[in-house]
A protein has these predicted regions:
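Catalytic cores of RNA-modifying enzymes
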Residues: 1-212, 216, 244, 255, ...
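C-terminal lobe and adjacent flexible extensions of AdoMet/dcAdoMet transferase-like proteins
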Residues: 198, 216-271
């Protein structure tokens, strides 16, 4: 069905938008089944050629808000609806022709389903985890597997920064591996579908102060944590006292601290 849609509507991937179309119908079905859809508020980000949209509609959500910047794709969607490829009856169905980083969800406790290109992964995660007023309940995101590896394995300092700002807000697990052969055109890298389940464990920790601490702590990743903090205009004696209070070794490296300790450090250091 997915390949038929591409052929019927003469859809071509745009390199400028980093488009790779998932054409394995079984995987599309699996993605649509990761979280509960029926009578829920769903936001689909960058639907592109609407194969997943069709599956979501079949599961009868309460509302389905699509966020798509590509005008050509929106025109194709309208054609598919006009041709009765699928019906949107009894669904609060909206198309938002807007940059996703400017999109502000109105509903509460919604789920996000998204297909995110590599270059905008971090900005989109930050937008929905930190910037929007109404946060999602969970997010199902198809992304390049090397991004998932960075979040999971933290093999470079930039990966630690990404992982920490995610861990503060949610638990992450790999829901599905997607081989590159399932896309048209096939990308160079395999993909994964990740499930982000938001929690409120650290909601009492100020987001702005936490992110500021992380930025300062990782400003020179080859240095010890204490040196980075002192070089960021924190008083050395204050830092040592805080480390002692939290039972942190004075010469600890940033990769040795877990998210709970980072949150404690953020709270105390900014008193």
């Amino acid at each position: 069905m997915s390949l038929e849609i591409l052929k019927k509507y003469k859809i071509r991937a745009k390199k400028s938008l980093w488009q790779n179309f998932l054409v394995n119908d079984d995987i599309v079905e699996e993605i649509s089944s990761i979280v509960d859809i029926e009578w829920k508020d769903i936001i689909e980000v960058w639907p592109w050629y609407w194969a997943l949209t069709e599956k979501l509609v079949e599961k009868k959500p309460k509302s389905l808000n699509l966020v798509e910047l590509d005008n050509d794709m929106i025109e194709i969607l309208n054609s598919r609806i006009k041709n009765n490829d699928f019906t949107i009856e009894n669904i609060d169905f909206n198309i938002n022709n807007i940059d996703v980083l400017k999109y502000e969800p109105e509903s509460i406790g919604y789920s996000i389903i998204a297909n995110i290109p590599y270059y905008i992964t971090s900005p989109i995660l930050r937008h929905f985890l930190y910037e929007v007023g109404n946060k999602p309940k969970d997010m199902v995101i198809l992304m390049q597997k090397d991004v998932w590896d960075k979040i999971l394995w933290k093999w470079k300092w930039k990966s630690w920064v990404l992982s920490l700002f995610i861990e503060k807000k949610c638990n992450v697990s790999e829901a599905l591996f997607v081989a590159k052969e399932n896309f048209v055109p096939a990308p160079k890298i395999e993909s994964s579908v990740l499930l982000f389940e938001l929690h409120d464990v650290y909601n009492d920790i100020n987001d702005e102060l936490f992110l500021d601490l992380i930025k300062k702590a990782f400003r020179e990743p080859r240095k010890k944590l204490i040196k980075n903090l002192v070089n960021s205009w924190y008083n050395k004696e204050l830092i040592i006292n805080i480390f002692n209070e939290l039972s942190i070794d004075e010469w600890v490296r940033w990769e040795d601290l877990d998210i709970a300790t980072w949150c404690q450090l953020s709270t105390i250091i900014n008193k």
